């Protein structure tokens, strides 16, 4: 009743191939839209009912820079996440989920397109340094949101987007006034099927965030004196309550929260106080990959970890509010609910403050998928990648036939439906790092259940190889590439086959 009472009162490949890539994507998108229009017209009217399990709602909540171990139920980090723990008990908690390119724009582009970086063109972060190289989400790509929009879903995107290239004159926000511009407006024609829009490109002042609303022009953004995740959860709950009375259509909602991204200190005091007594030195001693006190990265960890956990607990509380809104409105059982993150963060570990590396703290992400009555609650070590959620979720939602042929990432839906998920022994995930300004340089790798194998290439020449045995060396402290050449050769062949299969031109640097 709370839901309806509220509504009664409140209706509120390389650079030269870029043009070819755009043309190909445009052809595929037009073909796809024609196909799905015909398929949609053939559906019986009964299929459009809000409660029809063949047309479930989708609520996709993602944080930014949220480490895979940072859930209290995993007992790996001293962090408080009661709402996510509860959600994990009601759904599938994937303990080995990863981000294949652990940095914002590339990870998000892979999620939206189901294509790897050299295919979707987002080979680095969307900022003014990379604008000359065409680094932004293509309008011609068929995103999963395009598929759902074409299928009759009401769609909304709330929060961080970070898939548009900044162009001068830059939008007048603080993070566009330095040497590198980061923030950019996303015009309606670039929103890939999202009708409701309360978003920004990238903006890290979490206590005073800015947003563009659906009809706002480029210079018509507004600021909010509220912690970003709270504001975004408020807007998400409004959308859910409004859509709950629309019995003729399902909905797809994305809530993209920026915390626990930097700045970690920009979090309400009520969450900070929860970690005042945390013994940071004892915690650092438990993590052998954290440098000693008095080193730059060691001090970085000690200065920020309390606030990082505070951000996570704040995000957890907002997730709980959104889940409760679904339950209050009677939508929880017909909603496929996902919580995850675009990547993790090293937080000073291995001498790295940020991410964009192959260490577990950067690659591993939380992933919870809940659909009451359809997905069996359990923990699974299935190595699902952030980017795999495109085909996997659409298949679970009954839209497998509408997944475009451009999608490269893996559909795990048949495993999701198993009462006890059986992980394939040969399962692995790729790792990417690209140089947008120099396609002859970068890194490629694979992460298996036991090993992390990565090759660095500069100007077309292999310069370094890393091999970590995470079973005997979970902290990834010892590169054993030189002492295990046979293992490296085997993994190299697997990587070469993968790059060939996905038409990554980087393969030529590993085969000569």
Predicted feature locations:
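Formylglycine-dependent sulfatase
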Residues: 29, 34, 38, 47-457, ...
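Conserved, charge-rich beta-strand/loop surface module that forms ligand/interface-binding patches
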Residues: 471
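Bacterial Sec-dependent N-terminal signal peptides
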Residues: 1-53
